[in-house]
Design a protein with these regions (language model features):
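Surface-exposed binding/hinge segments that line
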Residues: 138-186, 204-211
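Bacterial signal peptide processing site
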Residues: 27-30
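Short, well-ordered beta-strand elements
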Residues: 35-48, 86, 96-100, 126-129, ...
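Bacterial N-terminal signal peptides that target proteins for export
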Residues: 2-13
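Aromatic- and charge-enriched surface segment that lines or borders ligand/interaction sites
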Residues: 86-136, 161
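C-terminal motif of bacterial Sec signal peptides marking the signal peptidase cleavage site
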Residues: 23-25
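Ligand-site clamp/hinge motif
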Residues: 193-196, 223-233
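N-terminal lobe/hinge region of extracytoplasmic solute-binding protein
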Residues: 42-92, 128-131, 138, 200
């Protein structure tokens, strides 16, 4: 990894740590009513995109982190923990990473998914998402994250494998970056560049409305796969 890329990774990790702390500290400021809870967050900088492939600064990262998930994530102690991948193995030569995916992760509702309005995330979705991230035509600022990746493939519906060019101990840390979030092909294909303002992901919140430079509204994702002891998140 280049020095510039490593510095960016540290910025990303630090941003997620700060935002995690913000969510905890602001929890007591949540407004309760008989029907809903409202969390208000003020961002001093305008959000540029809700497409994870363009989550390059703090404002974008915070918003995208509420909407999308990747294979792994970083906790408040900067440890890599499971996300959509429930566990993984690393080969003896430290070049092959095999991820076993959860079977209870669904995309946010959208009519394009058909009668059920949603569908389950599979390993093939990660193949598409990585292909998209690497595509020069997309010109994602995060394409460098996969520069040491030789190949990747879906072994089956719930197994995703990545082969590195050379061993890199911090690779799992790179995968926690929001650039590596899973996105649904049918939605991205439908919206094209407008996916930036019509995001469909798997995160704890789902997109409702965005008045750029004014306000951004999310709704709770009732189907979110990560829950606490009380069934919430």
């Amino acid at each position: 990894m280049t020095k510039q890329a490593f510095n960016y990774f540290l910025l990303h990790a630090g941003s997620l740590l700060i935002f995690s702390s913000l969510l905890v500290s602001c929890h007591t400021k949540t407004l309760d009513s008989k029907t809903k809870q409202v969390f208000r967050y003020n961002e001093h900088k305008n959000i540029g995109s809700l497409d994870p492939a363009f989550a390059k600064d703090n404002a974008d990262i915070w918003a995208v982190n509420q909407l999308f998930n990747g294979l792994v994530q970083m906790d408040s102690l900067m440890n890599v923990t499971p996300a959509i991948a429930q566990f993984w193995t690393i080969s003896e030569d430290a070049k092959v990473y095999t991820f076993s995916l959860r079977k209870d992760v669904n995309f946010h509702s959208h009519p394009l998914f058909g009668d059920h309005q949603t569908r389950r995330v599979t390993a093939h979705d990660f193949v598409y998402s990585f292909d998209r991230l690497k595509n020069p035509q997309l010109a994602s600022p995060g394409s460098w994250v996969l520069q040491n990746v030789e190949t990747y493939k879906a072994i089956d519906q719930h197994t995703f494998q990545i082969n590195l060019k050379t061993p890199f101990p911090a690779f799992l840390g790179l995968l926690t970056m929001k650039y590596c979030s899973v996105v649904p092909k049918e939605i991205v294909t439908h919206y094209g560049t407008d996916f930036r303002s019509n995001p469909i992901g798997t995160g704890p919140y789902k997109f409702k409305r965005w008045e750029e430079n004014i306000k951004l509204i999310f709704r709770k994702n009732e189907r979110y796969f990560e829950t606490n002891s009380k069934g919430g998140f």
